[in-house]
Amino acid sequence: MPDSSINSDSGFKHLSVMEDAVSQPVAALPAELLVGGLIIDATLGGGGHSALLLERHPDLRLIGLDQDPTARAAAAERLALFGDRVTIVATNFVDFSPAEPAVVVMADLGVSSPQLDVAQRGFSFRLDGPLDMRMNPQVGETAAELIGRLEETELADLIYAYGEERLSRRIARRIKHDLAEQGPYAGTAALAYAVAGCYPPKARHGRIHPATRTFQALRIAVNNELDALDRFLQKAPDWLVPGGLLAVISFHSLEDRRVKTAFLRDQRLERLTRKPLVASEMEIAANPRSRSAKCRFARRLPQATTADAL
């Protein structure tokens, strides 16, 4: 259902990544698809990619999905000039089914800058805040509750699997010891300090913070991100008209491998990018968070059904 909880005073400022990389394949679509066609932005965020496409293609319409109320408010403000061409839906993309097929389905899987930069969201180890990490702050288990519930071996396995962290067992041991001795961590800074202490002193001050992989793992687990991505990749091809475009921007190898495999093996899709597109040096200089972005495209084949998928 359309979102009725939007408040335009959002304070949500986000710089979208790889806008040109997304817009160019859309511009190359057949003209008949672009006339009156529908875009489904599965991760609307602040609405940057969608605003660009709506501006460049006046006949396109948009359905934007996001489970974060702050993001929806920002997108509503940014996209207001497009009027009834825009519908914003308060949902996770795994729970959505469109009433009509789209010419473009896109998903930007990254955590937005406002989510990272607001301490209260609990995503960042650089800003002290509660250990939350939920994309939808009204639903589900927090990171603090997760690390309290898991056994040490389960926590170690999670940090290794979702963070690709080689010191996962040492980190899990430290976390569970701290919780037993001191009670819950005061916030993200305390957890980051504990994780950094598991590294040798010389490894604590590199370009990548020692807590990066552990925080990634906890965020993925809290939001069930990889399972949600797998379900999206299964459903999204059926949201498209024949010849429609599926675009996915990922930010770490666990996501990109899934997208690559789905685009290669799904018989409903024709892979358009053998290797992912990456941000230019100019964009990285302007927006350092684009450094890890990878964008892949696929086209919906005609007369393919869900049975043709993996």
UniProtKB/Swiss-Prot annotation:
Pfam families: Methyltransf_5
One Gene Ontology MF term: rRNA (cytosine-N4-)-methyltransferase activity
Example GO biological process: rRNA base methylation
Positions that bind S-adenosyl-L-methionine: G47, G48, H49, D66, F93, D108, Q115
Record Gene3D superfamilies: Putative methyltransferase TM0872, insert domain (1.10.150.170), Vaccinia Virus protein VP39 (3.40.50.150)
GO CC terms of this entry: cytoplasm
Localization in the cell: Cytoplasm
Claim: Transferase is one of the keywords in the record: yes
EC number assigned by the record: 2.1.1.199
InterPro entries: RsmH (IPR002903), SAM-dep_MeTrfase_MraW_recog (IPR023397), SAM-dependent_MTases_sf (IPR029063)
UniProtKB keywords: Cytoplasm, Methyltransferase, rRNA processing, S-adenosyl-L-methionine, Transferase
Catalyzed reactions per annotation: cytidine(1402) in 16S rRNA + S-adenosyl-L-methionine = N(4)-methylcytidine(1402) in 16S rRNA + S-adenosyl-L-homocysteine + H(+)
Enzyme class: transferase
Family, as annotated: Belongs to the methyltransferase superfamily. RsmH family.
HAMAP family (UniProt xref): 16SrRNA_methyltr_H
Function: Specifically methylates the N4 position of cytidine in position 1402 (C1402) of 16S rRNA.
Protein name per its UniProtKB record: Ribosomal RNA small subunit methyltransferase H
Native organism: Prochlorococcus marinus (strain MIT 9313)
Gene that encodes it: rsmH
